[in-house]
């Protein structure tokens, strides 16, 4: 049974501006593991990566209905890729989390679907 859905879209230009104007932005948004991946990427891929993770985390908090808050902060949510490159969102929640991230030249978008198996 689907218990929540969320979607978020961000302009890459806006995220690039935040990264340039606020040196701590990357550390604020990304977990240590995400930062390690980020550091290994090309400049262009870094922008897509942080924008995609930003959008995925925003989509998740929309799906649970809380927004970024004390319950779910930026570092409570971690989005890494599995062995096939599929994004996996890790968080303490009793539900299956489906996440999809996509990029274009100007935007990053993410969708999260929360599913609970019937008991």
Swiss-Prot record:
Cited InterPro entries: 4-PPantetheinyl_Trfase_dom, 4-PPantetheinyl_Trfase_dom_sf, ACPS, P-Pant_transferase_sf, Ppantetheine-prot_Trfase_dom
GO cellular component entries: cytosol
Catalytic activity: apo-[ACP] + CoA = holo-[ACP] + adenosine 3',5'-bisphosphate + H(+)
GO biological process: one example: lysine biosynthetic process via aminoadipic acid
Binding site for Mg(2+): 8, 58
UniProt protein name: Holo-[acyl-carrier-protein] synthase
Pfam families the UniProt entry points to: ACPS
Chief site of localization: cytoplasm
GO molecular function: holo-[acyl-carrier-protein] synthase activity; magnesium ion binding
Family designation: Belongs to the P-Pant transferase superfamily. AcpS family.
Subcellular location: Cytoplasm
The entry's keywords: Cytoplasm, Fatty acid biosynthesis, Fatty acid metabolism, Lipid biosynthesis, Lipid metabolism, Magnesium, Metal-binding, Transferase
Domain of life: Bacteria
Cofactor: Mg(2+)
């Amino acid at each position: 049974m689907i218990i929540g859905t969320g979607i978020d879209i961000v302009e890459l230009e806006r995220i690039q501006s935040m990264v340039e104007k606020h040196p701590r932005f990357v550390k604020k948004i990304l977990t240590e593991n995400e930062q390690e991946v980020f550091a290994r990427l090309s400049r262009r891929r870094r922008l897509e990566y942080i924008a995609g993770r930003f959008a995925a985390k925003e989509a998740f908090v929309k799906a649970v209905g809380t927004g970024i808050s004390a319950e779910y902060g930026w570092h409570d949510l971690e989005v890494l890729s599995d062995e096939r490159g599929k994004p996996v969102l890790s968080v303490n929640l009793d539900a299956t989390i489906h996440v999809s991230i996509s990029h274009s030249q100007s935007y990053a978008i993410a969708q999260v679907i929360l599913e609970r198996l019937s008991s």
